[in-house]
């Protein structure tokens, strides 16, 4: 059985796929240059015709090139599904087809693509209920052993006072700035980077013009004692920041109160902004949280995710 990944381009996504190679026969679907050129040509011609031109035959060519079989699995993500010829590849794949929805989407999108897949999963529990899709735990890009090795190279001072935030504005800057001020008053060293976007109204000293590559983001994370995350409106699932906290032995200041419901919750590791009392912030910064169990960490590894996808095919 081969497992194909289609549209997984981000650096941390490729790291996840690489970590699976020891236990699974994983492949990345590569679209040949000539297929992309033909697709662009036919798409241009199609704009001049009264009906769209069927391009599923190009998807079949790509699948045949990779030697897919009925027992194989195709794993797609929602962010790249409608780009280029990806939907045509998914629709003509002969094996078990899975869509992982990692960002917030609407019912119109889900209804338009549901028929292409055997199973649709989301990392966000509220989105699962709203859109009638299956819940899947967020995955961390690295195995427990690889994360431990990365953490051992951490440049963190271990003082509990180095705090980092990195993310697009997305209307969250007011909350991020309030958190920054509260941490500054506690004598924390701040490494905050708010990436400007269309929601940015007034730039602060923490605003930057471009997002950092994942390796740089990872370096910042490893060098911090406390990670800061502010969830988007409507977002209830866990982000990579929660998993970085667990795997790298960090602390997290977050707006996501759902972590209090988890077995891994420790008030010495998690501070819930807007829920926990500001008076408890010094205690949080000074606390020594309980180590996270290996069983808990494994639940969020790529291997655990893939074991479930294989079992449910």
List each model region and its residues.
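Catalytic donor nucleotide-activated moiety binding site of glycosyltransferases and closely related
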Residues: 32-35, 174-211, 215, 257
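Short, polar loop motifs at secondary-structure junctions
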Residues: 10-12, 104-108, 121-129, 194-200, ...
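Active-site regions of enzymes building and remodeling cell-envelope glycoconjugates
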Residues: 23-30, 41-46, 95-97, 116-122, ...
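Structural alpha-helical scaffold elements that stabilize or flank donor/cofactor-binding regions
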Residues: 67, 113, 219-220
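Alpha-helix C-terminal capping/helix-to-coil transition sites in glycosyltransferase folds
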Residues: 70, 116, 222-223
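Catalytic core of nucleotide-activated saccharide and alditol-phosphate transferases
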Residues: 80-184, 308
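Catalytic binding pocket for nucleotide-activated donors in carbohydrate/polymer assembly enzymes
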Residues: 202-209, 214-310
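N-terminal pre-catalytic "stem/leader" segment of glycosyltransferase-like enzymes
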Residues: 1-96, 102, 119, 259, ...
């Amino acid at each position: 059985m081969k497992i194909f990944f289609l549209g997984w381009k981000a650096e941390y996504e490729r790291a996840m796929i690489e970590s699976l190679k020891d236990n699974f026969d994983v492949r990345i679907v590569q679209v040949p240059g000539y297929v992309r050129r033909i697709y662009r040509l036919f798409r241009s011609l199609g704009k001049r015709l009264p009906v769209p031109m069927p391009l599923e035959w190009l998807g079949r060519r790509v699948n045949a090139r990779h030697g897919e079989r009925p027992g194989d699995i195709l794993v797609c993500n929602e962010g790249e599904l409608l780009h280029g010829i990806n939907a045509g590849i998914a629709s003509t794949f002969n094996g078990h087809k899975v869509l992982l929805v990692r960002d917030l989407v609407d019912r119109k999108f889900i209804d338009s693509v549901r028929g292409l897949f055997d199973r649709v999963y989301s990392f966000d529990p509220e989105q699962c209920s709203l859109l009638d899709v299956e819940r899947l735990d967020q995955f961390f890009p690295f195995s427990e052993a690889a994360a431990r090795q990365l953490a051992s190279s951490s440049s963190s001072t271990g003082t509990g006072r180095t705090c980092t935030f990195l993310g697009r504005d997305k209307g969250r800057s007011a909350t991020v700035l309030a958190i920054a001020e509260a941490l500054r008053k506690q004598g924390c060293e701040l490494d905050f980077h708010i990436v400007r976007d269309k929601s940015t109204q007034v730039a602060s000293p923490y605003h930057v013009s471009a997002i950092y590559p994942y390796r740089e983001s990872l370096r910042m994370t490893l060098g911090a004692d406390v990670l800061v995350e502010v969830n988007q409106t409507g977002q209830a699932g866990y982000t990579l920041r929660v998993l970085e906290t667990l795997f790298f032995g960090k602390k997290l200041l977050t707006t996501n109160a759902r972590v209090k419901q988890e077995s891994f919750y420790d008030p010495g590791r998690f501070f819930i902004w807007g829920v926990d009392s500001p008076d408890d912030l010094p205690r949080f910064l000074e606390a020594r949280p309980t180590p996270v169990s290996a069983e808990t960490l494994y639940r969020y590894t790529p291997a655990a995710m893939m074991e479930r996808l294989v079992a449910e095919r």
